[in-house]
Amino acid sequence: ALGRVVIYMDADFRGGAEGSYTPRLRSAYVSFKGLTLGRDVTTFCDLQAAPTTIDFQGPNAYNFNFATMIRYEVSFARRHMTFGVAAEMPNVSATYGENFKPMHQRVPDFPMYLQYAWGDDRSSHIRASGVIRNPYMHKVSKNSTTSLLGWGVQFSGTIKCCDWFRLFMNGVYGEGITPYIQDLTGSGLDFTPNPEDPSLVRMMPMWGWQAAGQINITPRLFVSGGYSTLRVQRSHGYYTDDQ
């Protein structure tokens, strides 16, 4: 028997340009026996590691993005530990220049995580996550395809320090992982050409972190605030000063 089967779908009106109110399908999946099939928030995202914010997207170093996936999750050690792994449709955002062209991707992204939770209601946790990517591109000069290796790691969590204060955090580092850092999504910086030799491309190293706190004034009233930052680093001179 399949046991409990969940069929879920949700949508909003943020699918077009800002202020356009274009309908958008966010999630649509079937979940059973630890398997999730369909479209959901990426497995690399720790949904409980960011505070409630006025900004819909959350902190700029967070990663609240959606992907089409096959995911498996399992809890063990009296539900203190949870492991998850997925194959997700890749979303490549790169700067190709004149010597390379985009193409259909052949290999899915592979995000995974291991989480430890504690407390009577398991309301505090820390999580280690990783992702491996293999984006493909077409090399014009040789009329052939080539690929690069992208990867990322993340530490995240939320800690209930006491009844009136909760801490949120995440830190991420990797190469070519713009879909997994909120404000870099769609930036064209997964990989870029070498300004001195446009026939070469390289994955760009990037990192970000955020930390925030929530103060519960009453059971129904709270305030939250935090700090978040991110950066794309140079890699052997790749990407120019004005980017």
Regions found by a protein language model. Name each.
Residues 6, 93-96, 100, 104, ...:
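C-terminal/domain-terminus segments
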Residues 12-24, 101-103, 133-146:
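Outer-membrane beta-barrel proteins
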Residues 48-49, 84, 94-100, 138-142:
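A short secondary-structure junction signal
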Residues 60, 102, 201:
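Short, surface-exposed alpha-helical recognition segments that flank or form part
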Residues 101-107, 184-188:
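Short, surface-exposed, charged loop/turn segments at secondary-structure junctions
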Residues 121-242:
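Detector for outer-membrane/organellar transmembrane beta-barrel domains
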